[in-house]
């Protein structure tokens, strides 16, 4: 199912299911789920998912492919994911530019070293994943608090991966804001140095201000003004693309989340008027 560029969406979380099912038509343009959490789910939860995707387009954001991992990609899981995407007519599938497994699952999204070897390694695995999934995917810039090893900057690493893997970017604006603060670089310079043709979609979310120079990516609060402003800058640089509000816990009433979705739409309209 195709998404329009000015689509504004909300993350599908089980804690929000009753409210999402009762939501008025048109309140959101799409929902996003982690297929890892829904593959093989039946019963009431599975029925609820089917009811939602019958009327609202679905995108998917994976959690456990471990694109940067050292063990072989899980071919059986990738095939399960491929079938899930086909069944639910998913237009956009993304994964994290990270690793989350070694001898077992690590239950976290860990940063890769910013090295040429890591670029070659993760790019080859992205190409393999795309071939097995029979589709182009987007990778997301993750938030991180310490880099294992650096031969290059974060932006150089991201660009090298996008080029060698020939994949798209899901630009997480909150992660960019958090990383720029925590690691002392200019978020606007990061945007300028990204190739415009690679950005497929955006995420926005809330974070926690631990200290003036330390932000924690939580997805548990409202989007902060600086992140909204950075989203506007991204729209000016790359154009409006499907944009999702992520909220993973500490859920307010759905009406409050829909007000944030409406803020996405307002930023999109503002950018449209700028070109009108």
Swiss-Prot record:
InterPro entries xrefs: MbnB/TglH/ChrH (IPR007801), Xyl_isomerase-like_sf (IPR036237)
Family the UniProt entry places it in: Belongs to the UPF0276 family.
UniProt name for this protein: UPF0276 protein PA4106
Organism: Pseudomonas aeruginosa (strain ATCC 15692 / DSM 22644 / CIP 104116 / JCM 14847 / LMG 12228 / 1C / PRS 101 / PAO1)
């Amino acid at each position: 199912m195709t998404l329009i560029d000015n689509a504004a969406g909300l993350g599908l979380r089980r804690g929000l299911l009753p409210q999402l099912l009762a939501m008025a038509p048109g309140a959101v343009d799409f929902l996003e789920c982690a297929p890892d959490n829904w593959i093989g789910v039946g019963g009431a939860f599975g029925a609820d998912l089917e009811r939602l995707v019958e009327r609202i387009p679905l995108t998917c954001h994976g959690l456990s492919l471990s694109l940067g991992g050292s063990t072989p990609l899980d071919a059986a899981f990738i095939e399960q994911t491929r079938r899930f995407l086909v069944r639910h007519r998913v237009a956009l599938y993304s994964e994290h530019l990270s690793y989350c497994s070694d001898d077992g699952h690590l239950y976290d999204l860990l940063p890769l070293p910013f090295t040429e070897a890591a670029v070659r390694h993760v790019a080859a695995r992205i190409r393999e994943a795309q071939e097995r999934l029979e589709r182009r995917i987007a990778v997301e810039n993750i938030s991180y608090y310490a880099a294992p090893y650096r031969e290059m900057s974060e932006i150089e690493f991201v660009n090298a991966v996008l080029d060698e893997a020939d994949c798209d970017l899901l630009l997480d604006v909150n992660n960019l804001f958090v990383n720029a603060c925590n690691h002392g670089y200019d978020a606007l310079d990061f945007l300028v140095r990204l190739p415009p043709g690679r950005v497929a979609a955006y995420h926005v979310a809330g974070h926690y201000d631990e200290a003036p120079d330390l932000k924690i990516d939580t997805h548990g609060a409202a989007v902060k003004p600086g992140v909204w402003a950075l989203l506007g800058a991204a729209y000016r640089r790359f154009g409006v693309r499907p944009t999702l509000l992520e909220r993973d816990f500490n859920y307010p009433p759905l009406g409050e989340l829909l007000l944030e979705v409406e803020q996405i739409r307002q930023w999109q309209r503002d950018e449209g008027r700028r070109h009108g």
